């Protein structure tokens, strides 16, 4: 992991995405030392006790060896339907005022979720899925709406869970798009780029996103 982080830093990658739910990732990062990186971490799911979520965040800070993180995302978007969520969101803003968080945000999956957040909450950061085969947020205008409000956009799943880098072992779920994937591979081959380069360049060219 240390070598990976060194390689990332040497290539001007300065943001790390993690979560307490990602095994022991926060502990590993904390042991290596991540003072020179911007850290994005995520909340545990809200299951009735707001204080457990806040306590978990403080544990994340301790594990990471940080006094502040760049961003804290609500990991489970379904938490917004919880009766306690308004209390949690208020607590998150208190953490921001205390200087423990620079940006509050959400991890999302669908355009509808983004629309709901834009209509109901003020936030700084959002993580959204985006790739060659998933441009719903451009077509629906959500990316432009986020940009117009000054909300930082982080694109994830730019390789479609790795599918865009390896078409030889498609799961049953993705077999439905096998014909489209075959045409895509021909297009990529004709471009002279590798599968990785093509998928990465596609996302890099999207002006509304801030990071991938």
Model features per residue range: what roles?
Residues 1-37:
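N-terminal binding-site loop/beta-alpha segment at the start of enzyme catalytic domains
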Residues 10-13, 66-69, 101, 123, ...:
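A structural motif
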Residues 77-212:
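Beta/alpha (TIM)-barrel catalytic core signal, keyed to glycine-rich beta->alpha loops juxtaposed to Asp/Glu
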Residues 8, 16, 29, 60, ...:
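Conserved, mostly hydrophobic/aromatic
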Residues 1-8, 49-64, 109-116:
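Short, acidic/polar
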Residues 62-80, 210:
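Active-site groove signature of glycoside hydrolases
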Residues 29-38, 58-67, 117-121, 145-148:
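Acidic (Asp/Glu)-rich catalytic clusters
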Residues 36-48, 71-75:
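A short, structured active-site edge motif that brings together acidic residues
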